[in-house]
Amino acid sequence: IQPPKNLLFSSLLFSSLLFSSAAQAASEDRRSPYYVQADLAYAAERITHDYPQATGANNTSTVSDYFRNIRAHSIHPRVSVGYDFGGWRIAADYASYRKWNNNKYSVNTKELENKHNNKKDLKTENQENGTFHAASSLGLSAIYDFKLKGKFKPYIGARVAYGHVRHSID
């Protein structure tokens, strides 16, 4: 089955501070304003789309309602190359995501009739298998470093990224 072209992938990323000290140290010794930084990032991914709703007697949706709101969480590596201007930095980055699967099995039983010890049930079984892979993202970050006395240097930043998503329904 060909996946629809209109798939929206939104990701909220929280960078860990595990390896950010390497970038800070490189910029503090004033050898070069360029730096390379490795991060472990936490991603909370939500995949939605604009499939049509199955409304009306003659309109049926070809996509299960199960695939309308998929969520996943992952920890993945990210590498950045940036330039330090002194009080603020810019960086381009690449992140690689892990593959995750979504499988669902459901059974729905509805009693239709129960007369004279004769019971009629309607049983519906549904097996859905889908593989969604948020493969990678390319991003651009702008970071402002707060100047405080001491070793701890907080920062605030914003990141804009393009994410590549692949999915199939088995």
From Swiss-Prot:
It is found in: Cell outer membrane. Keywords: Cell outer membrane, Membrane, Transmembrane, Transmembrane beta strand. GO terms for molecular function: porin activity. SUPFAM superfamilies: OMPA-like (SSF56925). The keyword Mitochondrion does not apply. InterPro entries: OMP/PagP_b-brl, Porin_opacity. This is Opacity-related protein POPM3.
